[in-house]
A protein has these predicted regions:
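Extracellular beta-strand/loop-rich repeat segments of large surface/secreted proteins
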Residues: 1-90
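Short stretches within intrinsically disordered, low-complexity N-terminal or propeptide regions
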Residues: 3, 16, 20, 28-29, ...
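Residue-level detector of intrinsically disordered/flexible regions characterized by low predicted structural confidence
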Residues: 5, 27, 55, 115-117, ...
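Extracellular/surface-exposed low-complexity segments
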Residues: 40, 46, 63-134, 147
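Intrinsically disordered, low-complexity segments enriched in glycine/proline and serine/threonine
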Residues: 51-52, 93, 139-142
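A short, hydrophobic C-terminal helix/tail in secreted or cell-surface proteins
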Residues: 136-154
Length: 158
C-alpha cells in the first residue's frame, strides 16, 4: 500500500481515505505518525477481511475537538446485513486504524448510523475497533410487542 511520513488532518471540510472514496477498492496506507484536528476519515468496507486500513507506526494524536471530526463508512447494505447475521447480530472490524500505545486518540468514541446500520467506533489502546449492528427492527418489534400486550391486558380488564 501507500506509505507516508506524517498525516495531519486539520480542515473541517477535509476528507481522507486510504483509497479514493469512490473507487470501490479497499486498501492500506501506512504513516510514521499523525494527528487529527478536524475533518472526516472515510473507510471503505468491501468484505469481512477486505476494508480500508490506516496504520500509524508511531502515535496518532487527537489535537482538535471531536465535534469537528467525523468517521464515514462506505459499504454495500446487503453485504453488511450478511456479515452481521453471520456473526451473531453484530459485525466488528478490530484494526481499521492502528497506532502506538500512548496516542491521545485513545478513549475517543464515535457513534453513527449509515443506511440503517448503527455503528460504534472506539479508539482503544492501539487500534480503532468498529462494531456494526441492526438495532431498528428488533427495537420496533419489541415496542409493537409491548403495545399488543398492553392492548390485550386492557381488553381483558373490560
Amino acid at each position: 500500500g501507500m506509505k507516508g511520513s506524517y498525516l495531519s488532518m486539520s480542515g473541517r471540510d477535509a476528507v481522507f481515505s486510504a483509497t479514493s472514496s469512490d473507487s470501490g477498492n479497499a486498501g492500506t496506507v501506512t504513516f510514521d505518525s499523525g494527528e487529527w484536528y478536524a475533518g472526516k476519515i472515510v473507510i471503505d468496507i468491501e468484505g469481512e477481511v477486505a476494508y480500508d486500513k490506516i496504520a500509524f507506526e508511531g502515535k496518532f494524536n487527537k489535537t482538535g475537538n471531536i465535534n469537528d471530526m467525523a468517521l464515514e463508512f462506505v459499504f454495500d447494505g446487503y453485504s453488511m446485513n450478511e456479515f452481521i447475521n453471520a456473526n451473531g447480530g453484530e459485525f466488528t472490524l478490530s484494526d481499521v486504524i492502528t497506532y502506538e500505545t500512548g496516542s491521545s486518540m485513545e478513549g475517543t468514541v464515535f457513534e453513527g448510523n449509515t443506511n440503517g446500520f448503527a455503528w460504534e467506533a472506539v479508539f482503544g489502546d492501539t487500534a480503532l475497533s468498529v462494531t456494526f449492528t441492526v438495532p431498528e427492527p428488533a427495537e420496533i418489534s419489541a415496542l409493537l410487542g409491548a403495545l399488543v400486550l398492553a392492548i390485550a391486558i386492557i381488553r381483558r380488564r373490560k
